[in-house]
């Protein structure tokens, strides 16, 4: 009977994940508020059902009370976040909240399967991070001073990376973190956010060659410190954020092209300088033949293959024998017991989150906030690419964790902080939209008051259609609308591409 339930559950879980992923993209495209609300409600139901089924199956298999405790704690977190965001931040992006809750649910499920103690530790860090970051949207929304701290961001980021380089301990061939009173801190996770804020502040008003050089020098210092610490995966994340922000700010292709050329040369140099880089390239080329160097990549690939399209079912596989299954290779553990289809949906869900962040960036009228959203979105997408790409042998392994899914306190805190900043930008954009609409309505009322017969010249629906087709607005004098209004109208359909 238990085996039947386990085998049926994996198909139900896959179906729920497919439906949630499809609904996630549908919510991005949907413009009707009522229909979007129904989509979000359906997603919440799917999250609850998936958690219930997975934890119920694990309880049947093991009979541990700790499994029930983790289920109740996970449900308390998800429902608490949903309620608090709706009460405190009514303008927040609930699509982003739902995506975050689903990714965190997957994390809690697979970590409970692999190690209940690590799942509990992760939950404590998650709860504390969420509470600490709940004020971040208010700071982003009201904190006009943030754009004036440009050089403070630079000094803070360089200082944190330097401390790790000097005092950090080596793990996996790289200096990644420091330990204070038994607590490990990976300061590069915070530095990647301060770097984006620095570059946005530097290029928010002046994207001249001089400012580009300043931004390049500071970004290069960040990257070189990481290279000296042999943390090359994080260095690549920093570099990609730099390239994208520079291009968005200047719209000059030569800057990212020169950067990519420099990074390519640096990769060649790193290959000959660092032995662990050569080992990872050798594992990437032949994971079976280099089993004596490390078996983690081969074990991960075997695990995914043994799971097949729908997985073996929870507690029916052996993801526990995969080295660092809770961190770098958590995607392999997920695919082994939940299936490759589930893993593909997980990738698409991460892609949906990235598209949402980029869309928020596109709709920001102020360059400072636009560059922040673009930089943070790039870092998120790069981390997902490096983690999953390394575990499926698409690229050499980098040691980067999967955001919101892998075990790790610093990574969890920085990702929650990042998404809280994005929420603040989304709320700020909603405020700008409301203010813009008020100005439009006020101007329209003034025009009608000054010219009572004006509203009879053209019906409202015809006027709206004319504006959509022309992309211009007649202000009574035949002049085009100002830049902010034009950007607003042109980005209304930005998701329909």
Predicted region positions:
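Transmembrane alpha-helices of multi-pass inner-membrane enzymes
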Residues: 393-435
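Alpha-helical transmembrane segments
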Residues: 19-25, 81-83
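Hydrophobic transmembrane alpha-helical segments in integral membrane proteins
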Residues: 1-17
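TM-adjacent membrane-interface loops and short helices in multi-pass inner/ER membrane proteins
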Residues: 287-327, 331, 340-342
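Hydrophobic alpha-helical transmembrane segments of multi-pass inner membrane proteins, especially
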Residues: 63-293, 332, 336-390, 417, ...
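Short, highly charged, low-complexity non-transmembrane loops/tails of multi-pass membrane proteins
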Residues: 432-472
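Membrane-interface helix-loop junction between the first two transmembrane segments
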Residues: 22-39
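Membrane-interface alpha-helices at helix entry/exit sites of multi-pass transporters
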Residues: 36-39, 211, 326-333, 370, ...
